[in-house]
């Protein structure tokens, strides 16, 4: 049985993304918004899916998400709860009694998280008690506001400290260039340090790419973050497709991310998705019928990325793709050599291209014959991700070297003795970008491989004596 995954939604962005994620999972598992299955889940109806990773089954027909909602003000959590009919466990919600929010300050969010850590961890411990084969957490949050970044950072540290053997994945939303949060660059760099040090895998989204994709994807010209959240939820549901519609491969978080993360430092991943069909979004464009061959090659197009990528030559270290729908394996075999030709990969990267054949949910409405039959998601570990970090670091430097807005952090517990937290966080980002730059070289793993050769040689010598 696939292990259970607990989803933790932090802050306004995290909870709004979670709203669309759970709505998508309900559709794909044939569950109504009140948590009751649309089908009689008894011996006469054998499910083709596995609800256990993300839902607790309370009765034969009643399901509750393995979700925890956290915020410093009630609006976003209330919106999520009111969008469903008693779907979520009300005990799995923590909202600050003050209800004032973090005021877009990482420092305020972080300190509130530390102050209320025992209460929040009690909720998580209780949810863990309902699991039999717990695998890990997934954290939904933004990095530029106050709660998702600050409280999210303190929570990441606490999760790593208490559950060090559990896999922690973050789905982290980065701001657009036109962000209205003036201290956003500070918040982002402080959060990035925690993503570097405390997450096992971080899937990155940025609002620049999301807004551009939204304009091309939806027929409605008046798009908003409600539309971008649908794009994010499409990626989330597709990443977890092989866990919820399992086959003999890629049926755990570890089996997916082990194909993508060659070293612990290189754990930032870029999602691409195409096409956004009515299976995933409301009000999208219509697409012609396609094949897995078409989708796999289209996934390489930067225009289908949910992260703004630099246009110059980039290096891909590892790639994992899921194609969902009516898939002919011959189409995949045709596409793989062309993908290999188009991707610049270092010689040290072995088994760099991995493709999973996902299953379209049997609970979704049947497609018309003229509609496309395949959608695809690609997660890539690529040097292109550093462009997001370079933008964040550059914006941080412009503020920090002028001493702008630092007074908003002076009362924070981590800043009582000066600005070391800023300096150290910025240094962590520099080292991480250098690691990605080093990984572009064919010699990146030579030291490790040479050590392995020496060890093997040593064992051989012992055997000869």
Curated annotation (Swiss-Prot):
InterPro entries listed in its UniProt record: Gamma_tubulin (IPR002454), Tub_FtsZ_C (IPR008280), Tubulin (IPR000217), Tubulin/FtsZ-like_C (IPR037103), Tubulin/FtsZ_2-layer-sand-dom (IPR018316), Tubulin/FtsZ_GTPase_sf (IPR036525), Tubulin_C (IPR023123), Tubulin_CS (IPR017975)
Any single Gene Ontology cellular-component annotation: inner plaque of spindle pole body
Any one Gene Ontology BP term: cytoplasmic microtubule organization
Major localization class: cytoplasm
Pfam family, one: Tubulin_C
PROSITE patterns listed in its UniProt record: TUBULIN (PS00227)
Function text: Tubulin is the major constituent of microtubules. The gamma chain is found at microtubule organizing centers (MTOC) such as the spindle poles or the centrosome, suggesting that it is involved in the minus-end nucleation of microtubule assembly.
Similarity comment: family membership: Belongs to the tubulin family.
Protein name, UniProt field: Tubulin gamma chain
Organism from which the protein derives: Candida glabrata (strain ATCC 2001 / BCRC 20586 / JCM 3761 / NBRC 0622 / NRRL Y-65 / CBS 138) (Yeast)
């Amino acid at each position: 049985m696939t292990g259970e995954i607990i989803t933790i939604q932090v802050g306004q962005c995290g909870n709004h993304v979670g709203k669309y994620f759970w709505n998508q999972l309900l559709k794909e598992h044939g569950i109504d918004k009140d948590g009751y299955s649309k089908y009689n889940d008894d011996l006469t109806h054998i499910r083709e899916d596995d609800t256990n990773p993300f839902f607790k089954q309370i009765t034969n027909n009643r399901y509750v998400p393995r979700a925890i909602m956290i915020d410093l003000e009630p609006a976003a959590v209330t919106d999520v709860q009111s969008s469903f009919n008693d779907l979520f466990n009300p005990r799995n919600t923590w909202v600050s009694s003050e209800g004032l929010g973090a005021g877009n300050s990482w420092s305020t969010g972080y300190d509130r998280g530390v102050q209320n850590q025992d209460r929040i961890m009690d909720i998580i411990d209780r949810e863990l008690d309902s699991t039999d084969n717990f695998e890990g957490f997934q954290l939904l949050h933004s990095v530029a506001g106050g709660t998702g970044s600050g409280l999210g950072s303190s929570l990441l540290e606490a999760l790593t400290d208490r559950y060090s053997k559990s896999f922690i994945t973050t789905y982290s939303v980065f701001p657009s260039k036109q962000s209205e949060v003036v201290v956003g660059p500070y918040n982002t760099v402080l959060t990035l340090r925690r993503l570097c040090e405390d997450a096992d895998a971080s899937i990155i989204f940025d609002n620049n790419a999301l807004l551009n994709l939204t304009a091309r994807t939806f027929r409605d010209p008046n798009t908003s973050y409600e539309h971008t959240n649908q794009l994010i939820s499409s990626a989330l549901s597709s990443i977890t497709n092989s866990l919820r519609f399992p086959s003999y491969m890629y049926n755990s978080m570890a089996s997916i991310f082990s194909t993508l993360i060659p070293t612990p430092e290189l754990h930032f991943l870029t999602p691409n998705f195409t096409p956004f069909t009515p299976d995933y979004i409301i009000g999208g464009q219509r697409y012609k019928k396609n094949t897995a061959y078409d989708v796999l090659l289209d996934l390489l197009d930067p225009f289908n990325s949910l992260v703004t990528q630099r246009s110059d030559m980039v290096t891909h270290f590892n790639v994992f793709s899921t194609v969902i729908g009516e898939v002919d394996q011959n189409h995949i075999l045709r596409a793989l050599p062309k993908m290999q030709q188009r991707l610049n990969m270092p010689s040290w990267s072995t088994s760099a291209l991995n493709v999973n054949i996902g299953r379209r949910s049997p609970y979704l409405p049947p497609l018309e014959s003229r509609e496309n039959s395949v959608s695809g998601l690609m997660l890539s570990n690529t040097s292109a991700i550093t462009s997001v970090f370079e933008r964040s670091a550059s914006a941080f430097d412009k503020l920090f070297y002028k001493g702008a807005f630092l007074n908003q952090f002076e009362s924070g517990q981590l800043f009582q003795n000066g600005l070391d937290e800023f300096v150290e966080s910025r240094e962590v980002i520099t080292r991480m970008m250098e690691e990605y730059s080093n990984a572009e070289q064919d010699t990146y793993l030579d030291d490790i491989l040479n050590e392995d050769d020496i060890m093997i040689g040593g064992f051989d010598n012992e055997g000869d004596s």
